[in-house]
C-alpha cells in the first residue's frame, strides 16, 4: 500500500511520420472558402463563433417552428400522411424481411429441407423447387493494399477512441470512489465514536443494510420501546444523521406546575439543553430524553384515567390533581424550547421546590416501573391462556398524590396540636406532644433479594403513616393519633385513627376511623377538654398549699356534665358555683357563675345571673395572665 | 396443561457463545439453575385392584369408574425436582468434622450419621413433575406432551412418594441457564451424574458431593437447548397453534446458531413397563 504506482490509462499517441499534408489542406481550403484572399483572421473567427453558437439540431427546429405555424387541419392532414408513410415503411420492411427469410430458407433447403420448408412462403414453394439454390465458399479477391491500410487505420482509430473513453471512465470512477471512501471513512469514524460512548449500535431489524443506534428503554411499553431505535444514516458528505423516521425532532418534556388559589406558584425547571445541539451524541441524548418524557406522560395519562374517582382530571395534554382545597398540581407535556408560555405567568416561586421534587419523583417512579417490568418479564411465564394479561398502570401519580395529601394532613394536625399546646402553655398547663411524621418510612430497611434502589423506592409505594402522641395533664392520660394515607388499595384517602387512654372516662372511645379534618379536630379538642376538667377536679390537692393559710377551705369541683365542659362546686353554705370550660383551637375560656340552688332535675338554674368571673387564654400568650390553676384556686374560695 | 418443546444439541465449545447470543436475544442475563432430580417409578400396590368384571347388574358409579381407570391405567415414571445452589455441593466435608448434637435430626434416618450443615436435606423444597409420552401422530413439527407440576412437602420425600405408590429409582443433577423470551422458556442445560456410588442406595442422597466431582452424562460436555412453552388448555387448538408458532419463530431466529427440532418421541417415553 505504501508505494503506490501509477498506471497509465490513456493510450500513448505516437506522432507518426506523415507525408506533408500541406498541399492537401491548401486544396481543401480552396474548395471550402474559395480564394485565399477572402480568408482573413476576422472572418475565420466569426465563423468559429457562429459554429459554436449553432445548435446541431438547429435546422430541424427551424422546420418544426415553421410547421407549428400551420393550422390544425393541415397538421392533422400531415399527421395522417406521416402515419401512412410510417405504415408504408413498416410494410416495406416487413416485405423485405420476408424476402430475406425466403431467400435464406431457399438457401437452407438444400441441406435441411424439412426445417427450411416451414419458414418458406407459399409462393416461393410454388415457383422454386426445394434445394434449387446452393452456396459455396469462394475466396474473395485480395483487397488492394490501400483498402487494407484504411481498414487498419479506422480500426486503430476506433480502438484509440475506445481506450480513451475507457480511461476517462476509469479515472472518473476513481475520483468518485475516492470521495466515496472519504465520506465512508468519516461515517464509520462517527459511528465508532458513537459506539465508544457506550451506545448500542446494531443493524436495523426491518432494513438490514442500515445501522441503527439503540437509545430507548427496553422495559418501556412496546410502542415506546420500539421508538428507542433510530437509523444512523450518512449524508452525501459522510456526516452522520439520526433518522427517527416520522417522529418529530423536537425535544419534549413533562412540566410540573403547582397552582394555589388560581395562581401558578411553582414550575419545575427544565434541564438546560446541551450547548452543542449539533453533535450526534447530543442528538441521541435528546432523542432518548424525549422518548422517556413522552412515555412518562403517556403513563401519567393512563394512570390518571383510573384515578378519576380521586379528583384527577385529564385534558388533551394536561393531567391535573388536587392536593388540598386551594392547591392543585398540573402536569403537561411541552416542547422544551417553550419554557414559559405567555398565557399563564408564574406569579411566584413559592412552590418551585415542590414542583421540582415532583418532577424528579415521577421520573424516578417510572424508572422503578421499568425495573419492575424487567423483573416480571424474566419470571417464569404462566401457561398460555386465551386471555391476555393486561399490564397494570404504573404507580406514578398515586405515590406522589399520597405523599402530598399525607404531608398536608400531617402539617395540619401538627399545627392544630401546636396551637392547643400554646394555649395550654399560656394557661400554665404543660402537655407533652410528640410528632413523628412519616413514621412508616424506614429507609434503612433492606429487603433481601432486592437491590438497594428498588427497596428505597418501594418504601414510598407503601401506605404512609404518621403518628402523634401526647401525654396529657393528668397522669396516665394520653392519646395517640395515627394518620394513614392509602392511595393504591382501598380504603383510599387519608384517615385518622385515634386511640385514647383516659382512666377517668373509661367508656369514652373515639370512632374507629375518622376521615374529616374537622371531625378529628373536634374529637381531639374534646379529649383535651375532658383532660383539663379532670385536672381541675384533681386540682385541690396540689394547688391548695399556697392558699391554704388565707382561706381555710376551698370548694371542690365536680364534673357535672363533662362533655359540655361544666363543673359544679357545691358548698355547704348553699352558695354553689358552676364553672364552664370551653376549649377551641384559638382559645381556652373558663367562666364561673354562682348559682343559688339546684332545680328538680339537678340542673342549676343559673342563666339569669351574670358571670362572676371569666378568663380567656389565647395562644399568643399574654404574659401577665394568671395561670389556670391559680385562677381555679382563686374562684374556689368561698 | 400441555407443553410444546423443541430441542437442539449444543456442543461444549459453542456453549459460551450461545449463552451470549441468547442473552442478547432475550435481553436478560442468564439465570443459573441447579436442580436435583429424583426419578420415581410407579408400582401397583397389591390388593388395590378390585375390578368386578362381568357383573352387569353391578352398575358402577361414575366415580368408581374413574377411580378404576386411574388405578389400572398406565404407570409412569415421574420426576421430583428440587432446586439447589452451588454452595450446597460438597457441604458434607464440614459436616463430618463438626458433630452438632442440637442439629435437627430426622427420626427416620438411622444408617448415615447425618448432621447439620449448610445443605439441609430436611429443608429441601421439592416439586413433582409429571410428563406424559409425547403425543403421537401430530403433523406439527414440535413435540407436544401432557404435563403437570405440583409442589411437594419439604424434606424427606421418599416416604410420601412411597405412600402414593412410587418407588425411588435414581437421581441426577441438571445444571443450566434459563432465559425467558415472552412465553418461551429457554433452558440450556446438561445432565450431571454423581460420582460412582459405592453401594446401590435406594434413598435420595442426604449430602451432595463436591461439585467438581460431578461428571456430565455426555462425556464431551455438550449441552441441550430446550425451548418450551406451556399451554393451559391443550384442547384449545387456537392456543396450541399460537404456541407452536411462537416456537417456530424462535427456531427461525436461532437458525444461524442452532437447529431446534422435534425430539424423538420414544426417547421421551415416561411409561413404566
Curated annotation (Swiss-Prot), chain A:
It comes from the Eukaryota. Its main location: nucleus. Residues 1-21 are annotated as: Disordered. Keywords: Activator, Nucleus, Transcription, Transcription regulation. One of its GO terms (cellular component) is core mediator complex. Component of the Mediator complex. Component of the Mediator complex, a coactivator involved in the regulated transcription of nearly all RNA polymerase II-dependent genes. Mediator functions as a bridge to convey information from gene-specific regulatory proteins to the basal RNA polymerase II transcription machinery. Mediator is recruited to promoters by direct interactions with regulatory proteins and serves as a scaffold for the assembly of a functional preinitiation complex with RNA polymerase II and the general transcription factors. This is Mediator of RNA polymerase II transcription subunit 17. The lineage of its organism: Eukaryota, Fungi, Dikarya, Ascomycota, Pezizomycotina. The gene is srb4.
Curated annotation (Swiss-Prot), chain B:
GO terms for cellular component: core mediator complex; mediator complex. The keyword Lyase does not apply. The keyword Nucleus applies. It is found in: Nucleus. Transmembrane segments: none annotated. InterPro entries: Mediator_Med18. GO terms for molecular function: transcription coregulator activity. Residues 90-106 have a biased composition (Low complexity). Keywords: Activator, Nucleus, Transcription, Transcription regulation. One of its GO terms (biological process) is termination of RNA polymerase II transcription. Residues 90-114 are annotated as: Disordered. PANTHER family: MEDIATOR OF RNA POLYMERASE II TRANSCRIPTION SUBUNIT 18, MEDIATOR OF RNA POLYMERASE II TRANSCRIPTION, SUBUNIT 18. Belongs to the Mediator complex subunit 18 family. This is Mediator of RNA polymerase II transcription subunit 18. The lineage of its organism: Eukaryota, Fungi, Dikarya, Ascomycota, Pezizomycotina. The gene is srb5.
